[in-house]
């Protein structure tokens, strides 16, 4: 169930208003999967008549949905909590930090009135009621099992025309560097019908781009149907009236020939492959507890390019993993040079307590890991620039999302750009009013390119 009222978010904070005397502010930190949980909590409170604002100055209670994936994310979460505590706010700590540290947070932050785990956010109404009665609440399940569906109220904050849809929760993989299974539990997939129902709800709200997410989207359905079921899901979504469907977190082992064929044949599925490969060298992948990947990565990428020449490839990579030698890093550099990805995100390894990687010998010094990150980014940048430059003179579809009030330019994205992580397309001022184009997918002639972004002009309108 989705609330019908929408307001543009500001600074990643959720905005709601209602007639209820109680005022609750929401602050979201972390990934888009966490964002969906935030939106469900907002929807639940809105359905009960609570007033919710992004303005923490006026709020009696602040719900902070936190991230604890890596140290940098934890530090950001802690800074936000300390800042609110210094203001004397009553705080409800939700999300991964709450799941990670549990009652320790209540002990160390007196202003924390409740902690809500990743599998417990559906109880936010009861938690808030107990807090208002003076209780300090520990609502953290040891093993998260809950997964939200289309029947759980949700208040979207991602704009009127783009929405994430979580197809599964949790993860069954045990990568050596990752703490997510501890924070989110094992994989729990939603049914195809549940996902289609929510997609149809979103289509009625005018959504133009739907982004399917989970920890490993290509493993969708294995726990529910006994085999990977993404191809079946994509074909079921072909009947949903949403022009762009994008898939994030496609692990290579799950991109079977059937899935790649579904990408090709389902008209509203974008040929955009988000592949978190992490590394290329077999020994590093083995140390990461991903030994299966080295046997499929190159062959898979070649197969995708053969079947879908227009495919857009994004990957994320980790440098400085424990024991990574110069030769292994050079192998990764050569891999990036040869594969010519459209978009690459590079991260220096973060040593996380509770992971197998934290115990490994030969930890790479921070300075070396950062230098390797910088070098890999420098290798990828001219590749990304060349990919963009090759589009000059072509006409591409652009989803218009906002207007630059200073220049009059219309700003949006082509299908090759995912929200937040990729580039954007800036179109010179048009005689057509922004309000007439907002949320529409229009043809645009690309006239210029930058490292990550494109510029152009509206070509023609039917």
Curated annotation (Swiss-Prot):
This is Ribosomal protein uS12 methylthiotransferase RimO. Keywords: 4Fe-4S, Cytoplasm, Iron, Iron-sulfur, Metal-binding, S-adenosyl-L-methionine, Transferase. Catalyzes the methylthiolation of an aspartic acid residue of ribosomal protein uS12. One of its GO terms (biological process) is tRNA modification. InterPro entries: Elp3/MiaA/NifB-like_rSAM, Methylthiotransferase, Methylthiotransferase_CS, Methylthiotransferase_N, Methylthiotransferase_N_sf, NA-bd_OB-fold, Ribosomal_uS12_MeSTrfase_RimO, rSAM. Pfam families: Radical_SAM, TRAM_2, UPF0004. It comes from Prochlorococcus marinus (strain MIT 9211). It is an enzyme of class 2 (transferase). SUPFAM superfamilies: Radical SAM enzymes. Residues 389-460 form the TRAM domain. Its main location: cytoplasm. It catalyses: L-aspartate(89)-[ribosomal protein uS12]-hydrogen + (sulfur carrier)-SH + AH2 + 2 S-adenosyl-L-methionine = 3-methylsulfanyl-L-aspartate(89)-[ribosomal protein uS12]-hydrogen + (sulfur carrier)-H + 5'-deoxyadenosine + L-methionine + A + S-adenosyl-L-homocysteine + 2 H(+). Residues 157-386 form the Radical SAM core domain.
């Amino acid at each position: 169930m989705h609330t019908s009222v929408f307001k543009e978010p500001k600074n990643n904070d959720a905005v709601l208003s209602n007639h209820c005397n109680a005022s609750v502010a929401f602050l979201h930190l972390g990934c888009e999967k966490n964002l969906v949980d935030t939106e469900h909590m907002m929807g639940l409170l809105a359905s009960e008549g609570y007033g919710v604002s992004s303005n923490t100055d006026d709020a009696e209670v602040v719900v902070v949905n936190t991230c604890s994936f890596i140290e940098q994310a934890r530090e950001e979460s802690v800074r936000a909590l300390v800042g609110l505590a210094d203001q004397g706010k009553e705080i409800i700590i939700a999300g991964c930090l709450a799941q990670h540290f549990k009652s320790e947070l209540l002990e160390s932050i007196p202003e924390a009135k409740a902690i809500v785990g990743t599998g417990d956010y559906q109880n936010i109404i009861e938690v808030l009621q107990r807090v208002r009665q003076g209780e300090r609440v520990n609502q953290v399940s040891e093993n998260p099992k809950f997964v939200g569906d289309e029947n759980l109220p949700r208040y979207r904050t991602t704009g009127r025309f783009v929405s994430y849809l979580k197809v599964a929760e949790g993860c069954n993989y045990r990568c050596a560097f990752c703490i997510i299974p501890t924070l989110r539990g094992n994989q729990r997939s939603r049914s195809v019908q549940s996902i289609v129902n929510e997609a149809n709800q979103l289509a009625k709200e005018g959504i133009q781009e739907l982004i399917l997410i989970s920890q490993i989207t290509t493993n969708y359905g294995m726990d529910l149907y006994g085999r990977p079921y993404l191809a079946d899901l994509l074909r079921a979504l072909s009947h949903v009236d949403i022009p762009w469907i994008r898939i994030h977190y496609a692990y290579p082992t799950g991109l079977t020939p059937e899935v790649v064929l579904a990408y090709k044949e389902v008209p509203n599925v974008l040929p955009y492959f988000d592949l978190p490969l992490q590394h290329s060298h077999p020994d590093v992948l083995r140390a990461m507890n991903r030994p299966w990947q080295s046997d499929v990565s190159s062959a898979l990428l070649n197969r995708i390019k053969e079947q879908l020449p227009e495919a857009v490839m994004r990957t994320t990579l980790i440098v400085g993993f424990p024991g990574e030698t110069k030769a292994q890093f050079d192998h990764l550099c050569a891999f990036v040079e040869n594969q010519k990805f459209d978009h690459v995100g590079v991260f220096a390894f973060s040593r996380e307590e509770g992971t197998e990687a934290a115990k490994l010998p030969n930890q790479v010094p921070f300075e070396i890991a950062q230098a390797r990150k910088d070098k890999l980014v420098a290798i990828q940048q001219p590749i990304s620039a060349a990919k963009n430059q090759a589009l000059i003179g072509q006409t591409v579809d652009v989803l218009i999302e906002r207007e630059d009030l200073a220049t009059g330019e219309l700003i949006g994205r082509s299908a090759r750009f995912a929200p937040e992580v990729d580039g954007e397309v800036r179109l010179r001022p048009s005689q057509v009013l922004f309000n007439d184009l907002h949320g529409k997918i229009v043809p645009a002639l690309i006239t210029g390119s930058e490292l990550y972004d494109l510029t152009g002009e509206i070509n023609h309108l039917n």
